[in-house]
Amino acid sequence: MNKPFDKLKLHGFNNLTKSLSFSIYDICYAKTEQQRKEYIEYIDEQYSADRLTDILGEVVDIIGANILNVARQDYEPQGASVTILVSEEPVEEQQNYDADEAPGPLPDSVVAHLDKSHICVHTYPEAHPDDGICTFRADIEVSTCGIISPLKALNFLIHSLESDVVTIDYRVRGFTRDINGVKHYIDHAISSIQNFMTEDTKEAYQMMDVNVYQENLFHTKMMLKETDLNTYLFGLSTDDLSDEEEEEIRSKLTREMQEIFYGRNLPDLD
């Protein structure tokens, strides 16, 4: 972990823009066409615009901001999107700002304060036409202009959504000046996005970093280590499957997760 930054005395407003973008994937197996249809309907209801608004509202609470406007929409045949504009906090409340490179809070605590932000989410349910694999993706972006890193909301979002594979990008852009006129291109310590995650999260996932430190650009990929096949089955359980079927389904799920994690199609081994 890097040494924490000393607090900067700024000339005017903090003009740094910090953006957290990540895609969360939930993967399952549905054996029949009817089960795949029911999975899409389940996901569409589970992650409706109303529920996503509630989740993002919790994010706003975590970062200590105020909602200015909410735009939300459910789509046909499936999918939803929500965008929230957030107001800045009074200057006197910013004195409790925590810049440490450490995990952010879960939804039962509020520890950070925000200057300006927008938060948005889009969902993409889909199913393979004939091999039973179904994948739900949620794209989320939290962008702030000010002193607070949106990484403080990361833990809550990972725990709020069913996350089998996660890809995360964090970047800091622009600069802010101190009282001597010196430009600063980042105002907090960070060596890895992983340092903003709790230990239970790090233990549950296989992770890989690709960071470009000189560009203030950080990237982390996560893949769940879960081995219980029942957690990936929709509308059936392992009791309904033969040993051969279990092995085949497990192979399909593993392949799907690895292809998403590595961002490329794997060659057939047959």
UniProtKB/Swiss-Prot annotation:
Cofactor requirements of the protein: pyruvate
**Residue stretches spanning the membrane:** none
Q: In which pathway does it act?
A: Amine and polyamine biosynthesis; S-adenosylmethioninamine biosynthesis; S-adenosylmethioninamine from S-adenosyl-L-methionine: step 1/1
- Which positions are tagged coiled coil? none
Swiss-Prot/TrEMBL keywords: Autocatalytic cleavage, Decarboxylase, Lyase, Polyamine biosynthesis, Pyruvate, S-adenosyl-L-methionine, Schiff base, Spermidine biosynthesis, Zymogen
What EC number(s) are associated with this protein in UniProt? 4.1.1.50
Single GO biological process annotation from the record? spermidine biosynthetic process
What chemistry does it catalyse, as a reaction equation?
Answer: S-adenosyl-L-methionine + H(+) = S-adenosyl 3-(methylsulfanyl)propylamine + CO2
Sites annotated Cleavage (non-hydrolytic):
K116, S117
Report the InterPro entries cross-referenced here: AdoMetDC_fam_prok, S-AdoMet_deCO2ase_bac, S-AdoMet_deCO2ase_core
Supply the Pfam families for this chain.
Answer: AdoMet_dc
- Provide a Gene Ontology MF annotation, just one: adenosylmethionine decarboxylase activity
Q: Which GO terms describe its cellular component?
A: cytosol
Q: How is it modified after translation?
A: Is synthesized initially as an inactive proenzyme. Formation of the active enzyme involves a self-maturation process in which the active site pyruvoyl group is generated from an internal serine residue via an autocatalytic post-translational modification. Two non-identical subunits are generated from the proenzyme in this reaction, and the pyruvate is formed at the N-terminus of the alpha chain, which is derived from the carboxyl end of the proenzyme.
Cofactor binding note from Swiss-Prot or TrEMBL: Binds 1 pyruvoyl group covalently per subunit.
Active site at which residues? S117, H122, C145
Q: What does the UniProt function comment say about this protein?
A: Catalyzes the decarboxylation of S-adenosylmethionine to S-adenosylmethioninamine (dcAdoMet), the propylamine donor required for the synthesis of the polyamines spermine and spermidine from the diamine putrescine.
Family named by the database record = Belongs to the prokaryotic AdoMetDC family. Type 2 subfamily.
**How is the quaternary structure described?**
Heterooctamer of four alpha and four beta chains arranged as a tetramer of alpha/beta heterodimers.
Q: What is this protein called?
A: S-adenosylmethionine decarboxylase proenzyme
Protein's organism: Pseudoalteromonas translucida (strain TAC 125)
